[in-house]
């Protein structure tokens, strides 16, 4: 966990939670500091990837202002072709950004972690592909439609209790509602 304190000194609002034990599920209230953390990582990625990264965006639940989320920052990186990222695997590794097998079809997946505490997921996707479009559309749709965000939040919270020790099943349990919300977003 990354813990940062603010000027108020209040213990309750001074801990920024980033990171979660691999394989587990715990949702926490949205924290404004997630955006700043994402921007810092995006800045590093821009420096490391240069023009290969056509766009880099904070996505996933930590980028949706009104909902609970696993305290793992998701970042999507758009490239012309997935293969464009391959020459950067070693450079990224030197910055504690590790290639991870078993990603979603159509993307290359990296993680940032400290031991078994995972802090960031970095999704490399084609700029004109469905993956990029889905990440951006989903985030923007839920940020623009608070009632849909709350519906998704309620579903996630129930699923997190049910699958607290099985992140794969938790993720699989959300696919139907995510598909429904993406259909609405793309209408």
Model regions: which residues?
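Helical scaffold of the NTase/Pol beta-like nucleotidyltransferase catalytic core
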Residues: 4, 9-57, 179
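Short aromatic/hydrophobic-glycine micro-motifs
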Residues: 94-98, 187
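Catalytic cores of NTP-dependent nucleotidyl/adenyl transfer enzymes across multiple folds
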Residues: 124, 130-187
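Conserved catalytic core of two-metal-ion nucleotidyltransferases
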Residues: 97-130
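Short, flexible turn/loop "capping" segments at secondary-structure junctions
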Residues: 17-21, 66-70, 114
